[in-house]
């Protein structure tokens, strides 16, 4: 699949700056997106080495297209572990089928990727959380159907203990995005996301408030090995 289907269109996709979602769906149909997830979420319960081999081989054909399995595995680990079962099932079965992509929004203009030093605010308002602030350098920010957002629910002095995570559908009112003019990796794209009084259902909270730092670290523990294999490919 990597050599026959992914490699031939690499330059055309990069020049167009557009992700080929039909090719992503092909990948999903072959079971090559987040196979380490449980079968209930569309995976096959495979091990880390299996998932890593997929990323390495896809990256050998097209480094940028390898973001498809990489981002799926990173977000999949977090959603499978912390989202409500019905929400995880809804999003992850579509993700593993290649119907959608997901992004992860941690990095901010002032604090970088310091997960304990976030400025984006998330406040409870009845059955919703209201998000205000900016994320930047987010991969797939304009093509993702949803984004796992890490935001501050506690006081700034709470540090890591005041960070929470929530799954945000990207079609909600109040969300705007921009795309960086990159030298490469144009298929997936990178850019900023602004949240202006974005109302997200409270049921989309991942786990408990104040547990976001531990959640993102758990996701990164898995994805770091995949990033290394992406570079190796």
Give a label for each model feature.
Residues 119, 128, 132-178:
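A short core secondary-structure module
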Residues 63-86, 112-115:
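N-terminal glycine-rich flavin-associated loop
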Residues 1-69, 86-97:
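Amphipathic, small/basic residue-rich leader segments at the start of a protein or domain
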Residues 2, 31, 38, 54, ...:
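Buried hydrophobic positions in well-ordered alpha/beta secondary-structure cores of metabolic enzymes
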Residues 60, 112, 136-142, 222-226:
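Glycine-rich phosphate/pyrophosphate-binding beta-alpha loops
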Residues 46-47, 114-116, 140-145, 158-162, ...:
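Short glycine/proline-enriched turns and hinge-like loops at secondary-structure junctions
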Residues 60, 165, 175-233:
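Glycine-rich beta->alpha junctions and the first turn(s) of the following alpha-helix
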Residues 98-106:
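A short, Trp-centered hydrophobic/proline-enriched beta-strand micro-motif
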């Amino acid at each position: 699949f990597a050599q026959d289907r992914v490699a031939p269109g690499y330059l055309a996709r990069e020049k167009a700056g557009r992700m080929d979602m039909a090719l992503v769906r092909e990948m999903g149909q072959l079971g090559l997106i987040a196979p380490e997830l449980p079968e209930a979420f569309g995976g096959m319960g495979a091990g880390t080495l299996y998932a890593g081999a997929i990323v390495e081989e896809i990256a050998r054909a097209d480094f940028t297209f390898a973001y498809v399995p990489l981002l799926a595995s990173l977000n999949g680990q977090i959603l499978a572990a912390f989202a409500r079962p019905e929400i995880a099932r809804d999003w992850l079965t579509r993700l593993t089928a290649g119907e959608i992509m997901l992004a992860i929004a941690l990095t901010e203009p002032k604090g970088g990727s310091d997960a304990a030093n976030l400025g984006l605010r998330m406040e409870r308002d009845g059955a919703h959380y209201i998000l205000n602030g900016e994320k930047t350098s987010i991969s797939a920010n304009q093509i993702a159907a949803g984004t796992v957002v890490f935001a501050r629910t506690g006081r700034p002095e709470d540090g890591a203990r005041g960070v929470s995570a929530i799954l945000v559908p990207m079609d909600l009112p109040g969300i705007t995005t921009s795309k960086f003019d990159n030298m490469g990796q144009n298929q997936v794209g990178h850019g900023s996301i602004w949240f202006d009084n974005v109302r997200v259902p409270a049921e989309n909270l991942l786990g408990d408030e104040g547990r976001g730092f531990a959640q993102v670290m758990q996701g990164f523990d898995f994805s770091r090995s995949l990033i290394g294999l992406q570079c190796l490919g």
